[in-house]
């Protein structure tokens, strides 16, 4: 009532823009890291064929799946740590 009490402060447009930019940077960085790691692991350094082989495609598929699964698991673990009040280096 009347702006007093438990109302959360409004986030400004500038803060929303900064948060969106930070999220975009994070997603772009994660994508670039994924491409670099899976490409170096799965694609032969000397291209013998103009198309991705079945073996390379399977490796890439597994690499991407593992990468995302790992990120989900890490995110869930960090969320649990945050909810329980644990922080890095402290248990």
UniProtKB/Swiss-Prot annotation:
Keywords in alphabetical order, please: Chaperone, Disulfide bond, Membrane, Metal-binding, Mitochondrion, Mitochondrion inner membrane, Protein transport, Translocation, Transport, Zinc
Lipid bilayer topology: Peripheral membrane protein
The UniProt record lists the keyword Cell inner membrane: no
Molecular-function GO term, any one = metal ion binding
Superkingdom is: Eukaryota
**What GO cellular component entries does it have?**
mitochondrial intermembrane space protein transporter complex; TIM22 mitochondrial import inner membrane insertion complex
Offer one Pfam family short name for this entry. Answer: zf-Tim10_DDP
| Disulphide bridges | 38-63, 42-59
User: What GO biological process terms are annotated to this protein in UniProt?
Assistant: protein insertion into mitochondrial inner membrane
UniProt keyword Plastid, yes or no? no
- Twin CX3C motif, short sequence motif: residues: 38-63
Q: Where does it live in the cell?
A: Mitochondrion inner membrane
User: How does this protein assemble?
Assistant: Heterohexamer; composed of 3 copies of TIM9 and 3 copies of TIM10, named soluble 70 kDa complex. Associates directly with the TIM22 complex, whose core is composed of TIM22 and TIM54. Interacts with the transmembrane regions of multi-pass transmembrane proteins in transit.
Task performed by this protein: Mitochondrial intermembrane chaperone that participates in the import and insertion of multi-pass transmembrane proteins into the mitochondrial inner membrane. Also required for the transfer of beta-barrel precursors from the TOM complex to the sorting and assembly machinery (SAM complex) of the outer membrane. Acts as a chaperone-like protein that protects the hydrophobic precursors from aggregation and guide them through the mitochondrial intermembrane space.
Q: What is this protein called?
A: Mitochondrial import inner membrane translocase subunit TIM10
User: Which organism's genome codes for this protein?
Assistant: Debaryomyces hansenii (strain ATCC 36239 / CBS 767 / BCRC 21394 / JCM 1990 / NBRC 0083 / IGC 2968) (Yeast)
């Amino acid at each position: 009532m009347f702006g007093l009490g438990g109302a959360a402060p409004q986030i400004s447009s500038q803060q929303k823009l900064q948060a969106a930019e930070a999220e975009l940077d994070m997603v772009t960085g994660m994508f670039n890291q994924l491409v670099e790691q899976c490409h170096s692991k799965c694609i032969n350094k000397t291209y013998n064929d103009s198309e991705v082989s079945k073996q390379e495609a399977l490796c890439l598929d597994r690499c991407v799946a593992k990468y995302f699964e790992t990120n989900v698991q890490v995110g869930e673990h960090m969320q649990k740590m945050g909810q329980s009040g644990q922080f890095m280096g402290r248990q």
